[in-house]
Amino acid sequence: MPRPGQPRPSSGPPRLGPWERPSELCLETNDERSQPPPGRRTRRPDPKDPGHHGPESITFISGSAEPANEPPTCCLLWRPWGWDWCRAAFCFRRCRDCLQRCGACVRGCSPCLSAGDPIEGSAEAAWAKEHNGVPPSPDRAPPSRRDGQRLKTSMGSSFSYPDVKLKGIPVYPYRHATSPVPDVDSCCKEPLAEPPPTRHSLPSTFTNSPRGSEEYYSFHESDLDLPEMGSGSMSSREIDVLIFKKLTELFSVHQIDELAKCTSDTVFLEKTSKISDLISSITQDYHLDEQDAEGRLVRGIIRISTRKSRSRPQTSEGRSARSTAPAAAPDSGHETMLGSGLSQDELTVQISQETTADAIARKLRPYGAPGYPASQDSSFQGTDTDSSGAPLLQVYC
């Protein structure tokens, strides 16, 4: 029992005097990991609780309370002098490449930058704070995304190669700062230069017609009646018609067929003196070059040789000779049937007389005409041949 006035001894370990306290207990430790975080209290389970659940953790969440200042992730020391040392050494080591490129560390080590340096995340954070955490949309996009879209729009929607050319034409010709950027979906092509019109081209009326092809249309008889245009330039079709007339006047149909065998599509394989003179006259009369005149002449020869109607146009002498003869009816445009100069009334009918050979041949028939007397010749005994005795040819008027 302690005496009255004396302190009651504690049940713990005896206290040491100031002279007996060890010096090792004065060391300070900065390890705070063993301490529970503030705002969390643990309650042990009640022994009378039949469920015997584990310890409960009660967490107080306050919207007005500000989060506790956590130590920076850049280094372990979070004291002011330690952080200065960490910013000088550790951040410089991590962001050395970034400092060499842009002169400022913009990723990962933002604490090592000064307040005046441009930071990429500051604009993003300001935009997020302004829009109160609303997710970005096409109408509301952060600055980095707008810059990326602007760059993509200026370079094209599918790929970003500004020097691509298609058949020598730049696909994206609008790449200068002064020129406006065209629509992305539109095809950015420079208009092709229109070829100059040729001197001997077909008019628009012939181009739209079924016979508008300059090289493959065929002549009809009505084509030869086209009047020559003395004033002005002649069309290509009229030049070919005149060449057709010259060919039919100089050569016969057989000669034109032989000339067609000695030609390719547009060139003579062998030129005679008459062909050379004809080419030179065509070049002078119609103001064509020699190659064009030769090609037109070859096409005219091939066209004439492949026509179904091989009749040449009638000259003045032939027309006067034919004017006296009666005109024959046309049969589908081809003169295949010519009128005969003889009349049926002028023909004389001659009847041949029956000879012995005719009589023998008539007797050889197994079934002769009834009423013909039987032959008494020994070589034809027993045959039932009969003949009427009518002549071989009988005229019915």
Swiss-Prot record:
This is Keratinocyte differentiation factor 1. Residues 321-330 have a biased composition (Low complexity). Plays a role in the regulation of the epidermis formation during early development. Required both as an inhibitor of basal cell proliferation and a promoter of differentiation of basal progenitor cell progeny. Pfam families: DUF4656. It comes from Mus musculus (Mouse). Residues 1-16 have a biased composition (Pro residues). InterPro entries: KDF1 (IPR028003). It is found in: Cytoplasm; Cell junction. Transmembrane segments: none annotated. Keywords: Cell junction, Cytoplasm, Developmental protein, Differentiation, Phosphoprotein. Residues 201-211, 375-388 have a biased composition (Polar residues). Its main location: cytoplasm. Residues 1-67, 130-158, 192-214, 304-339, 361-392 are annotated as: Disordered. Shorthand (Shd), a recessive ethylnitrosurea-induced mutant with a frameshift that results in a longer protein with the C-terminal being out of frame. Shd displays shortened and fused limbs and craniofacial malformations, including shortened snout at 12.5 dpc. The affected mice display a thickened epidermis with increased basal keratinocyte proliferation and poorly-differentiated epidermal cells that fail to form a normal barrier at 18.5 dpc. Shd homozygotes died at birth, likely due to the epidermis covering the mouth and nose openings, preventing respiration. The modification Phosphoserine is found at residue 218. GO terms for biological process: developmental growth; epidermal cell differentiation; establishment of skin barrier; keratinocyte development; keratinocyte proliferation; limb epidermis development; morphogenesis of embryonic epithelium; negative regulation of keratinocyte proliferation. Residues 44-55 have a biased composition (Basic and acidic residues). The gene is Kdf1. GO terms for cellular component: anchoring junction; cell cortex; cell junction; cell leading edge; cytoplasm.
